[in-house]
Amino acid sequence: TLSELRYAEKAGTPKSFAQNDLHIDLQKLKKGDYMLQCFAAFVNLGDKTPGADPLVTALEEIDVFKRIMEKYPEDIAPVYQPSDIRKNAAEGKISGMLTIEEGGCCKGSIGVLRRMYELGVRMMTLTWNHENELASPNVVPGGGHNIWPCTPNTETGLKEKGFEFLAEMERLHIIADVSHLSDKGFWDIVEHSTRPFAASHSNCRALAPHCRNLTDEMIRALANKGGLVGLNYCSGFLDNQPEEKLCRSTTALMAKHAAHFKQVGGIEIIGLGSDFDGIGGKLEMDDCSKLPLLADALRREGFTEDEVEAIFYRNARRFFEENL
């Protein structure tokens, strides 16, 4: 969302966060009864735009976040520490948590990482879809979300600088996000982390064999570490069709993935990741106001009301309150 808003500004066609044509805006968040929304400063290291600088991009998107928080203080407020979530909820405000999707924007500098924390960043992926100074990702040849071919990267994971970043992130209480990370990188995090970590937008590889998804072994390891996984609404990560154009994004498929997560790792690990404003295609739940559709699908899949509430907000609230 921050990336889309920044891009619109630079194109001379700014969008209002109050109401726009994106998956997420303030009106839709209110309609969806959101407790907390993570806002990712997204950086594409493959951007060939002349003069593109990953650090500048991240800082400009963080500036978009700051301006949103300043413009709508009665409706949404930032989260820097666990008490902020409770305070915002008590005041009837949505919590906005700043995250980074592409640790490479820090250019391998621990000093920049510390500055990101000071700016409010509380969760970060080590990579997006490009190798950087920190680690290697799981990527599909040619890009995109196509299921085939999709060979997980089991050879290269965290680099020396990546391990340094992990240690400093844990000291600062910036949550390590393993979505996009290679299989080897995931297991490096499992072995070396001392705090719970998240897979903010990943599904089950057993149901959709995409290398961006988690194997059952990974799900169990994440659960054993006290982690959180966010359901991803992207069709290529939900369906098991061999061609992306055939894949569907339906609430029924999301509920199937939730049921598998529950069976393998337990109900307490499941949250909502969405990847809204980072995915395209035909979505049954096509913006954040449509969450009741997913609640209904979960009930049809056999989830109790208590479990639906756990998935929708309690698990994420507990995870962030314990780990920020």
Please tell me what each predicted stretch does.
Residues 183-184, 203-206, 235-238:
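Short, catalytically relevant binding-site loops at active-site mouths
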Residues 1-152, 209-272, 276-324:
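N-terminal hydrophobic targeting/anchoring segments and the immediately downstream early-domain regions
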Residues 149-190, 199:
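Loop-centered beta-sheet repeat module
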